[in-house]
Amino acid sequence: MLNKLIERENLSFEESYELFNMLLNESEMRIAAYLVALQTKGVTADEIAGFAKAMRDNAVKIDLGEVTDTCGTGGDGSKTINVSTAVSIILSCFTKVAKHGNVSITSKSGSANVYEALGCKIPETPEDAKKSMDKTNFAFLFAPKYHPALKKIMPVRNELKVKTIFNILGPLANPANPKYQILGVNSPDLLDNVAIALSKVGGIKKALVLYGDGLDELTPNGTSKITEYNGKFETYEVTPKDFGLDYAKIMPCESPDESAKRLIDVFSGKLNEDRNFILMNAAAALYTSENASDFLDGVEIAKEAIESGKVLKKLEEIRNV
């Protein structure tokens, strides 16, 4: 298959699935060759889907029932608060959330970093994650604990210091096999391919793949692009006005501790620039998980959860598991 990639020929879903499993037993030199050849050619939806399905199949198994995930590819280079973590906690007031996360890639506040800064403990085992889900409707799945098969590949990625298909795979490889997913990407070119790949991995009922003018979140100060999958695909653009919200500045964030403090400020009802950023993305997640009829409804539901104290109470429940 290496020659095929060098000749810039695309792989099928089946070939990509096979290649992932081959890489687990290859030398570091050949792993690097495959990853660079694939990246140079440009990855397709079938290749992303094949790798993601193989990554899930090689993951530590966990059954949490019908869950939603909110995460992004990262790698957008932004210094923002960790919106997806805020959204996942709000969403868990209404439905089961399995947050598949890791430490920071390029931001100042990766989801695992912020989760711990909020005073929450990352579950050590699938049994601990199930306990958290049963008690709180929320479980944090720390990616390295569920993908031990990647131990051989990760050093190669780090040594290469270039983007590879693995920069895309994290959100597609949640071992809990979410039925609903909101997934941010760091380039508009990835929208359709990632949405198609997500549909091919299997099990997804509804998903939003989104890009927010340089962010892997919906942006509160410009236009965002969304590819929605609900048995069929639809691509459209949105602004804060579609959510009934005013435009808001994106304020830089310098650390996980700062991100955690600012999330708690919003959860406490503070009216600031972060609030609309979080409300917009929470509304999209509520809509995706079928807990809101549309984006406007989602904003009102999220607002009520914050203003009634439900979200702060939920955070306290998660802390105390």
Curated annotation (Swiss-Prot):
A GO CC term attached to the entry: cytosol
Pfam families cross-referenced by the UniProt entry: Glycos_trans_3N, Glycos_transf_3
Family statement: Belongs to the anthranilate phosphoribosyltransferase family.
SUPFAM superfamilies: Nucleoside phosphorylase/phosphoribosyltransferase catalytic domain (SSF52418), Nucleoside phosphorylase/phosphoribosyltransferase N-terminal domain (SSF47648)
Record-level GO BP terms: L-tryptophan biosynthetic process
Cofactor binding, per record: Binds 2 magnesium ions per monomer.
Annotated binding of Mg(2+) 2, by residue: 216-217
Protein name: Anthranilate phosphoribosyltransferase
Species, as recorded: Methanococcus maripaludis (strain C7 / ATCC BAA-1331)
Residues that coordinate or bind anthranilate 1: 72, 102
UniProt entry keywords in alphabetical sequence: Amino-acid biosynthesis, Aromatic amino acid biosynthesis, Glycosyltransferase, Magnesium, Metal-binding, Transferase, Tryptophan biosynthesis
